């Protein structure tokens, strides 16, 4: 838990600093090859974004989505997993004390059917970001397509570990075990398969 808390703090610190840098660049001149034209750089928020986060690393994944959205100037509707809403409820209390204007951050708890699906299809949402299973990701994309909104998906993957013939075998075994069993294997980047050079197979499995 301490690692997660440190990660969350570092994420918000990073994007807070980035936001200040973006403000300094607003309306800056863009060099062009011709003096007959001029251009200025202006970044604008895309609008209200919907963030749907998973249960396995709830607060960390929330920080990865929420901090950049706020840094970009977007208002946010956050839907935590119905299994693990408590970290986000605590975050909402912290945000309420921070002085963030009302309505910039909004937390809606509930199931995917009750909250996630309507959020994905709502025309007032300009962008939806979802982390979770492939099956639900398909549904999010389909509902978002109804209003042609921006979509970011991070879905369950197949993270292979390649052990080549010249690998440090002790390190390879350590990484394979750590990758497969860290957090009980309940994460999208868990080592779901190991591809080992044929000549190392027996020694690797021993």
Regions found by a protein language model. Name each.
Residues 38-39, 107-129:
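A structured beta-alpha segment of the ubiquitous adenosine-cofactor-binding alpha/beta core
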Residues 88-97, 112-122, 135-146, 162-166:
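Active-site pre-lysine segment of PLP-dependent enzymes
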Residues 12, 73, 105, 128, ...:
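Residue-level signal for inorganic ion chemistry
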């Amino acid at each position: 838990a301490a690692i997660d808390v440190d990660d969350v703090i570092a994420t918000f610190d990073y994007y807070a600093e980035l936001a200040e840098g973006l403000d300094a660049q607003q309306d800056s001149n863009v060099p062009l090859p011709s003096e007959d034209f001029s251009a200025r750089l202006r970044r604008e928020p895309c609008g209200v974004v919907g963030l749907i986060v998973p249960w396995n690393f709830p607060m960390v994944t929330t920080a990865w989505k929420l901090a950049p959205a706020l840094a970009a100037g977007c208002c946010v509707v956050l839907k935590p997993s119905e299994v693990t809403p408590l970290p986000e409820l605590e975050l909402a209390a912290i945000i309420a004390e921070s002085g963030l204007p009302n309505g910039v951050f909004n937390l809606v708890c509930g199931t995917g059917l009750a909250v996630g699906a309507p959020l994905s299809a709502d025309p007032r949402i300009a962008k939806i970001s979802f982390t979770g299973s492939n099956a639900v990701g398909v549904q999010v994309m389909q509902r978002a397509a109804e209003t042609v909104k921006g979509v970011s998906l991070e879905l369950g993957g197949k993270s292979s570990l390649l052990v080549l013939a010249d690998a440090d075998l002790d390190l390879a075994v350590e990484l394979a075990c750590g990758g497969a069993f860290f957090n009980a294997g309940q994460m999208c980047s868990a080592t779901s398969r190991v591809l080992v050079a044929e000549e190392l197979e027996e020694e690797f499995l021993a």
